[in-house]
Amino acid sequence: VRLVSASLALIGLAAAGLAWWLLAGSIAEPRGASSMAVRIGLALAALLPAVIVLAAMILAQMALRFASGAFDPLAGRDSLLLHVNQRVIGNTLEQMSIFAPALLAWAAGAGAPAMPWVIALGVVFGAARLVFWIGYLVHPMARALGMAPSFVAALAALGAAIAAWSA
């Protein structure tokens, strides 16, 4: 069981790393990125893929509650799907609470040449959260395919922010 989970995590990490590298390489340094305000604006825009995924998760949860009639989450009538989606939403918020400020701090502290990497990491993080959600719906072990890459993306942003502000 652990071997399967670890294997899925490694596959997800490899795919996310490759996607980050390819995407960053395809993004030109944005005009005006020498300005901290522009860099922060770009980093906020880079968070939109993850915010869109989170909004879809919340919308799905609301629709499931409406369709099932399980309006009171404290009544003990939540289906397995409602429980899974709630865990997905909770974990996404936990990871975003690390990723979002770290990405903004990295963008603010780094120079313009870092911005393609910042933007690409935002896209990869959002995609990884979507893979996590789909994986969890398939099987709890399959969530590792998206969980590992999104957490490593959060740690990468945090490390890059620390490095940018330590220089």
Residue ranges and their predicted role:
Residues V1-L54:
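Long, highly hydrophobic alpha-helical transmembrane signal-anchor segments
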Residues L130-L155:
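Interfacial loop-to-transmembrane junctions
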Residues A105-W133:
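Hydrophobic alpha-helical transmembrane segments and immediately flanking/interface helices
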Residues V51, G90-L104:
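Core segments of transmembrane alpha-helices
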Residues L48-L64, G126-I134:
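Transmembrane alpha-helical segments that form the membrane-embedded catalytic/substrate-channel core
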Residues G32, A56-L80:
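Membrane-helix interface/capping segments
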Residues L158-A167:
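Juxtamembrane boundary at the C-terminal end of a transmembrane helix
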